[in-house]
């Protein structure tokens, strides 16, 4: 069942999702602006989805956006007349209201819901479009969209094209079924393929005035309730199978307890199915008669959704990390989110060009996924804050392969990256001398160039806050080993832009005196690399550093 069709149910007392996030520290004017813009965006999405059958955003992002709206409204006491289903409401009454379903937030919530219940069943939560199917004398005569649960749109014009749906029952029954129209998929594994926009395809087709037979043949039906059916779920499923609705029994399992529910949830998440799903439905065998059903979440059904494939995250700040070569990487600092089993508070945008393209500012809401199930990745900007906070962006012209050889406020990050590379395993391989140590030494004024550490004494180190006697001894030992590393390791550590297989010889002077033609003669060195090598070796800061290393009697200099 589509999540958007259940939104009004979440406003009922006791059904709102728990939200333990702190309230933003915003003045009233900004709070009103943020809520107003969020309402406009949601209204725009609702209108496109319900009138045109076009989903502008994934269901899970829509759901999280609704939750964020409720959070802000609760924080700032900003009630609204927002009606998510205003454009979904049709003119035709359902013979039996669609109840919707309450969502269980996490495993403890599922365990609490199951506690003490008997006769439980579990089914896949098919990701499609909810409908009522009205049969008269065994013939399908009316097809109604869920609408607002009470009034739906008449989609009966599509019945002749829906060849995969039972249009004539084997018995002349006058009855109503409720179910999900879904887009038929071959061997669809939800954990791997995600939703595949399956629900959006069906919603878009049904919003049309007319379907072709080919389009209609792609639509299947999963009957999930028979309001006037037998009293027990087992009997209902058996009779549904006899009537031709075989998937209902095929994908329904009687369970006892949480462990069984968790097993089937994982099984259907990772097993090939003929439709997309977004969780499982837990269903109690006993239920009241259909005359008492209302368009609200009932006590006898609940949904346990799959983990989000995308999470909505609010940007707290933007930091621009500058690497050793001057590459600028924007890092979004996020309000922490949970995605799968990971807590994420930072995500890289990869390049300055991508940040410029997306124009992300603090306060914006972005969609975050896990690339390869491990690496956080920004998929899109979902909501832009009406307050476009200024962002201080490093100038790419100030940071490049030959910039920042000394400590300064503008060069702090790139210079620290140079030190970390020099002492790392690609350079001098000084154990215990990482970014934190270099930061301490630079902040205390003990290191301002790439060679200053060669002059540090025990007394110098003990003057640095956070460095005691034992640590000072370990650092001196690491520095001593680093000093004695071979010439080639020093060159790699300083960032010589040569191919990995290049053998530099044993003398800096000979290396620095090479011309472009000599570099071009080296295997793997083209025109661009030759120019980089020439510029590196002739740069005044690099030459000054080489002279200092020669004064320290470093091998090769």
UniProtKB/Swiss-Prot annotation:
Signal peptide feature range: none
InterPro entries membership: DNA_ligase_B, DNA_ligase_CS, DNAligase_adenylation, DNAligase_N, NA-bd_OB-fold, NAD_dep_DNA_ligaseB, NAD_DNA_ligase_OB, RuvA_2-like
GO molecular function, one term: DNA ligase (NAD+) activity
GO biological process terms, semicolon-separated: DNA repair; DNA replication
Gene3D superfamilies in the cross-refs: 5' to 3' exonuclease, C-terminal subdomain, DNA ligase/mRNA capping enzyme, Helix hairpin bin, Nucleic acid-binding proteins
A Pfam family assignment: DNA_ligase_aden
Family: Belongs to the NAD-dependent DNA ligase family. LigB subfamily.
Protein name from the UniProt record: DNA ligase B
Organism: Pseudomonas entomophila (strain L48)
Gene name tied to this protein: ligB
């Amino acid at each position: 069942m589509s999540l958007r069709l259940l939104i009004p149910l979440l406003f009922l007392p006791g059904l709102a999702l728990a939200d333990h996030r702190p309230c933003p520290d915003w003045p009233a004017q900004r709070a009103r602006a943020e809520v107003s813009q969020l309402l406009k965006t949601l209204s725009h999405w609702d209108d496109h989805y319900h009138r045109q059958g076009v989903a502008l955003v994934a269901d899970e992002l829509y759901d999280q956006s609704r939750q964020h709206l409720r959070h802000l409204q609760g924080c700032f006491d900003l009630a609204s007349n927002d009606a998510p289903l205003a454009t979904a409401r049709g003119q035709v009454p359902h013979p039996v209201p669609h109840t919707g379903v309450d969502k269980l937030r996490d495993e403890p919530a599922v365990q609490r819901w199951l506690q003490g219940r008997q006769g439980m069943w579990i089914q896949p939560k098919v990701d499609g479009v909810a409908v009522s199917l009205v049969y008269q004398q065994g013939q399908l005569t009316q097809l109604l969209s869920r609408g607002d649960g009470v009034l739906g749109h008449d989609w009966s014009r599509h019945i002749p094209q829906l060849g995969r749906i039972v249009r004539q029952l084997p018995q002349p029954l006058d009855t109503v079924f409720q179910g999900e129209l879904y887009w038929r998929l071959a061997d669809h594994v939800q954990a791997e393929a995600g939703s595949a926009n399956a629900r959006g395809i069906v919603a878009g087709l049904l919003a049309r005035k007319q379907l072709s037979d080919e389009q209609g043949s792609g639509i299947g039906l999963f009957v999930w309730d028979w309001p006037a059916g037998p009293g027990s779920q087992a009997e209902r499923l058996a009779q549904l199978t006899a009537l031709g609705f075989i998937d209902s029994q095929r994908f329904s399992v009687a369970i006892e307890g949480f462990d069984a529910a968790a097993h089937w949830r994982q099984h259907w998440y990772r097993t090939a199915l003929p439709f997309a799903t977004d969780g499982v439905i837990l269903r109690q065998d006993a239920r009241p008669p259909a005359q008492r059903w209302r368009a609200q979440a009932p006590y006898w059904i609940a949904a346990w959704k799959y983990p989000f494939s995308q999470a909505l995250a609010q940007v707290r700040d933007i930091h621009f990390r500058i690497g050793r070569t001057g590459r600028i990487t924007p890092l979004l600092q996020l309000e922490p989110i949970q995605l799968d089993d990971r807590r994420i508070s930072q995500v890289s945008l990869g390049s300055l060009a991508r940040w410029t393209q997306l124009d992300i500012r603090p306060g914006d809401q972005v969609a975050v996924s896990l690339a390869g199930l491990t690496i956080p990745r920004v998929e899109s900007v979902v909501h832009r804050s009406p307050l476009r906070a200024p962002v201080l962006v490093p100038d790419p012209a100030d940071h490049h392969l030959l910039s920042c050889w000394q400590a300064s406020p503008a060069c702090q990050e790139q210079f620290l990256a140079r030190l970390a590379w020099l002492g790392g395993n690609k350079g001098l391989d000084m154990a215990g001398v990482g970014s934190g140590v270099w930061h301490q030494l630079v902040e205390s004024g003990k290191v301002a160039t790439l060679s200053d550490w060669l002059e540090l004494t025990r007394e110098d180190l003990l003057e640095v806050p956070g460095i005691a006697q034992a640590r000072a001894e370990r650092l001196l030992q690491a520095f001593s080993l680093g000093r004695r590393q071979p010439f080639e390791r020093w060159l790699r550590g300083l960032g010589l832009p040569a191919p990995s297989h290049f053998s530099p010889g044993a003398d800096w002077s000979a290396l620095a005196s090479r011309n472009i033609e000599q570099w071009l003669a080296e295997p793997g060195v083209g025109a661009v690399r030759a120019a980089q090598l020439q510029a590196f070796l002739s740069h005044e800061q690099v030459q000054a550093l080489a002279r200092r290393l020669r004064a320290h009697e470093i091998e090769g200099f």
